Amino acid sequence: MARQREVLSRVVLTTLLAWSPVAPPQDRSSAEIVVQVSLTAGLRYHEAKAVWDRMRVGDALTLVREAANPYDGNAVRVDWNRHQLGYLPRTQNEAVARQMDRGNKLEARITKLTQYRNHRRKLEFEVFLPLTAR
C-alpha cells in the first residue's frame, strides 16, 4: 500500500511539474498544488525541542536536499528558520528528491503541531509546488 502511494505521488508530481503555466510577471497571481502531506522523521534527534514553542501552523519550512547523506541517497532535510527539525520520511522522499535534483522549486509549511503528555511531538507538514496562473 505504501509503495502504491509512493508511485502515485511520483506520477502526480511529475505530471504537475510538466504542466507549468507561464505569464508575464505583471499578470502573475499565486497558486499552488499540494504534492504530499508528511510527518517529520527524526524530530526528537534534532532541534525541534528547542524551537517547538516558537513554531506555528502555517510557518514556512525549508527543504534541503542532502544527496551525499550516507544513510539515504534521497534524503531531504526539513528546517525551520535555520534550525534542523528532521527529514522527509525515507518512504516518502524519492519523488521530492528527484524533483529537487531537477531544479524544481518545492516549498513546505507546517500544517499541524501535536505535543503529547509524554513529551512526544509530531510535526505534520505539506510539500507544495508554487504555480503562477493568468
For the regions a protein language model found, what residue spans apply to each?
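Conserved active-site motif detector
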Residues: 2-134
